[in-house]
Amino acid sequence: MKYFLAYNSWSKTEIAEVAKVLKSGNFTMGKKVYEFEKKFAKYFGSKFAVMTNSGSSANLLMMSVLKYFPKFLKKKKIKNPNIIAPAIGWSTSYFPISQCGFKIKFVDINIKSLNISAKKVEKAVDKNTVGILAINLLGNPCNYNRLKEIADKKNLILLEDNCESLGSKYKNKYTGNMGLMGTHSLYFAHHIQTMEG
């Protein structure tokens, strides 16, 4: 038996919608994207949504906001700021951290959920820690009660890479909305997709 990473699941309606976009000559941004952003934000209970070409780019955008708009950081003027991240994730979760000038401080996972261990996070926080990146792996939400508690106590920002868990909930709230910012992915191999995004 063969298992494919992805396969063509486009309906006639979806193909017709893609054709409309192609015929319009407006391939990026535009009315359809604006409508999607508004509906996406409303559905998932977020104030805002910004569409990018991929979850990888969304992660880079999220970290760039912290680099270029440090007012969002709770700790100011840290010389060597670090962000705590789980030891299991995707390279596209980690590269943006270092690309934007932050050090990555890896911590171990909880073996039952495969997500970041709140106990390990608490022990890893030091004077240069400015944030926690929680990655909701394979539809499993992190322990946000504990992560928020740690972030509040230690004056840190909480960020989410929700690219692998669109539609997951933690205590009746969609993941991707637990911290300051969260990212999602609609890549072709995911359960809900827009081809590349």
Which role fits each region the language model picked out?
Residues 7-8, 87, 137, 185:
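Conserved donor-binding loops in enzymes that form glycosidic bonds
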Residues 26, 30-82, 96-100, 106, ...:
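Phosphate-binding glycine-rich loop
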Residues 68-153, 157-162, 169:
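PLP-dependent aminotransferase-like
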